[in-house]
UniProtKB/Swiss-Prot annotation:
Taxonomic lineage of the native organism: Bacteria, Pseudomonadati, Pseudomonadota, Gammaproteobacteria, Enterobacterales
Species name: Buchnera aphidicola subsp. Diuraphis noxia
The KARI N-terminal Rossmann domain, residue ranges: 16-207
Sequence positions that bind Mg(2+) 2: 216, 388, 392
Gene: ilvC
Disulphide bridges: none
Chain sites annotated for binding Mg(2+) 1: 216, 220
Active site: 131
Protein's UniProt name: Ketol-acid reductoisomerase (NADP(+))
Free-text comment on the cofactor: Binds 2 magnesium ions per subunit.
Catalyzed reaction equations: (2R)-2,3-dihydroxy-3-methylbutanoate + NADP(+) = (2S)-2-acetolactate + NADPH + H(+); (2R,3R)-2,3-dihydroxy-3-methylpentanoate + NADP(+) = (S)-2-ethyl-2-hydroxy-3-oxobutanoate + NADPH + H(+)
Keywords: Amino-acid biosynthesis, Branched-chain amino acid biosynthesis, Magnesium, Metal-binding, NADP, Oxidoreductase, Repeat
Amino acid sequence: MNYFNTLNFRQKINQIKKCRFMEKKEFNKKNEILKNKKIVIVGCGSQGLNQGLNMRDSGLNISYALRKNSILKKNQSWINATKNNFLVGDYESLIPNADLVINLTPDKQHSNVVKELQKLMKKDACLGYSHGFNIVEKLRNIRKDITVIMVAPKCPGTEVREEYKRGFGVGTLIAVHNENDYSNMGLEVAKAWAFSTGGHRAGVLESSFVAEVKSDLMGEQTILCGMLQTASLVCYEKLITTQNHPGYAGKLIQFGWETITESLKHGGITLMMDRLSNSSKIRAFKLSQEIKEFSQNLFQKHMDDIISGDFSSKMIQDWKNKDQNLLNWRYKTKNTSFEQSPDYDKKILEQEYYDHGILMVAILKAGIELSFETMIQSGIMEESAYYESLHELPLIANTIARKKLYEMNMVISDTAEYGNYLFSESAYPILKEFVKNINNTDLGSALPRNSVNNIELYNVNTMIRNHPIEIIGRKLRSYMKNMKTIIVG
């Protein structure tokens, strides 16, 4: 049985609903509480390295604890840490003196890692996570004299660093584990950690471990990763069947997600739809409604399996089977026609991504709204649902622009990658069947700018702008004034 299922109904609801948008003044103390403290990050992968770089640049003392075998073999974590001039040591040499130990190893390693860390950590130390899976989905009891906190940036580690270097940050959830707040200082430490990664600049939600895990799993399985992967494969194949050049088709998809979702950062679904002509907007709206209708049951099934723990049980079983399903899905993805598509050296103008990508816009709108709606129906608060659907989407799209789906799956967590493939396996045949009957002007060429009915356009605009995710989005984006724009690929 996992931790979540040991809670009674009232406790489950209270933890799922915990969500408070924090005011800027709550970060006035900056990271003073962590200055001159010994902070040890365990693991130096994508999140570990990039959070550590930000924290060091914010004036903190950071070192990395790796397994002795990793140090002897000089594996990738050792290379990441030493190349960036961090102090590296084994658990026994660094953990006993650490004031804050941040566990940023892959989820599947957490049980064994935390078991070792607890034996070495001093009394009244803090143990940090950036994803609460190990706490919520497994019955993991932590020593009562250890304070357990979480700072969860809502994006891959690479984007945590890139946004920080731009002088901004990424939206972040912070939490203190109900069972482990020994010193009553957990929230203050979490705030200082979030400040040090730059999260305070983009907005921080005070949440719970439960709310973070359940919403995070839903977002990454559906719109953030699963829908992007499924749509990339299906849209590319459709473009090829309509006689588009493979290089052009690949580039339109690879860079199209990043270009189109850039508008989400600044003006939500409303701005994304406003980038289309009036006739294209109405067409995208109709397509999105159809996509929502046939996708609803799949989204709800994933949410139900996440809430019940069924998803986690199946994934943990795959871990025990040496990632048999995960590795098979990864191999299949690597060998898809989209991943193997040739380079295309001609420039695609920014507006062309919208004009030739009406279907892509429709898929994004449908997936964002459906993911958000399904989370809300399950008790997750609007702010959390926004962060885990619309807000993080441009940051995931950025990774596809670098090296297609390979890059996305390499930088997201092992848990996210598994959930992504699981969703895509079911969604792919459904979406593929749908696109058989779309118009050529829905993808790959532009829809003529025909005259439209004023009343129809007015009603479409009203429905777009009054969707609950747009209402909460306008509030949250008011905190995010300094976001930098991308260079169009």
